[in-house]
């Protein structure tokens, strides 16, 4: 790695304030390589690459089940019409719906499907000028990264996410993505821990996201799970569980890992 991009501690708050005068802290860790990406443009680019390689995206199409067949799978889908598709591999990267897809895979042991907890995270945007030129992350809170500062490619400053644990029996297809405006006061309190100059009435509701987690409130945070044939014993099947918000950052590494599993089985067979 380029030495200029390595993380380095800022042992005194004065060093951090020289870089970010609005920041209040005791110490900080500088990460020069951290940044932002246009997630929509990234996905559009990846889709174009996939389609150029022969893939097809089928939207508004629900996975309704799969059965093992002749070393591969017959997958059933439902939408305007029902279809059956014969395939060599099923890679379940359905996010919030990954457990539902696994349960609809005939013969897959239910005991191997991990419990899922859903954590809703709110974001509020800032009216006015951005106070920082870098991303700012406070110490993590239970279940999340803490209410951190970020900015989009248009320069809009945002804060979030918080953590709102949803009832464990909430169906993934009945989730509410509205921003709860009454949570704003907690945002003011959290943000003022590292930006005391935040003015009242300067936050506006932005958006929410819901994270599929493999550990619940107060529990030790668990990592992603990539369960392939070596784990569950079924050929041509990979389940990705608990791929929550860091999954976008790790998406290319996850894809490389999944591809290595597919290639390893293909070589053996």
Annotate each PLM feature.
Residues 84, 89, 93-233:
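Active-site substrate-recognition segment that forms the wall
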Residues 49, 100, 104, 257, ...:
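Active-site catalytic microenvironments for nucleophilic, acid-base chemistry
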Residues 78-83:
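A structured beta-alpha segment of the ubiquitous adenosine-cofactor-binding alpha/beta core
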Residues 220-269:
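C-terminal lid/capping helical subdomain adjacent to the catalytic/cofactor pocket in oxidative enzymes
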Residues 1-53, 58-59, 65-76, 218:
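Flavin (FAD/FMN) cofactor-binding and adjacent substrate-gating region
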